[in-house]
Amino acid sequence: MNRRSERIWIEFIMGSRKTSNFCWACILLLGSLGFLLVGISSYLGRNLISLFPSQQINFFPQGIVMSFYGIAGLFISSYLWSTILWNIGSGYDRFDRKEGIVCIFRWGFPGINRRIFLRVFMGDIQSIRIEVKGGVYPRRVLYMDIRGQGSVPLTRTDENFTPREIEQKAAESAYFLRVPIEVF
């Protein structure tokens, strides 16, 4: 979702609250709970899951391994649910011609650097750069080159833009900021 006028352009960035992250977090949670229940049922010798008798799985070594996989899966799942809850990576890019300032804001992990805020003068922006990596999984990322500070990504590295979409986004950004486009 974008808000745009002649002087101000605000582009909202979607964070970790994507459908794919929800799906993976649910799959990991359910799968790891299943592994953990099978490991516990093999230890207790009872059927906690009625799909198969617990006597078919010995606690040593299969039950221990399944319990370990279940616990590891719960940790990974809790990490995914935490990133979804905190909405890591979300924020906005605000380009303000009137003030001559570009503000980039992102939410990070809780702690000292929870709020990531970068403020740059438009005069310090050298160019908008498109970086293209080919291969089986091509990657196209849009960067803003800033004098003295390096490059700042304007798009997520995991977004799969078509060449036309990334060119359109780069052209809009370069036109609004009045800077050239570079392709690498």
From Swiss-Prot:
Q: Which GO terms describe its cellular component?
A: chloroplast thylakoid membrane; photosystem I
Q: Which UniProt keywords apply?
A: Chloroplast, Membrane, Photosynthesis, Plastid, Thylakoid, Transmembrane, Transmembrane helix
Q: Entry's Pfam families?
A: Ycf4 (PF02392)
The subcellular location is: Plastid, Chloroplast thylakoid membrane
Keyword Transmembrane applies: yes
| Residues passing through the membrane, by range | 22-42, 64-84
Q: Answer yes or no on keyword Nucleus.
A: no
Query: InterPro entries this protein is in?
Result: PSI_Ycf4_assembly
Which superkingdom? Answer: Eukaryota
Major location category of this protein: plastid
**How is this protein situated with respect to the membrane?**
Multi-pass membrane protein
Q: Name the GO terms of the biological process aspect.
A: photosynthesis
Stated family: Belongs to the Ycf4 family.
What is this protein's function per UniProt? Seems to be required for the assembly of the photosystem I complex.
Protein name in the entry: Photosystem I assembly protein Ycf4
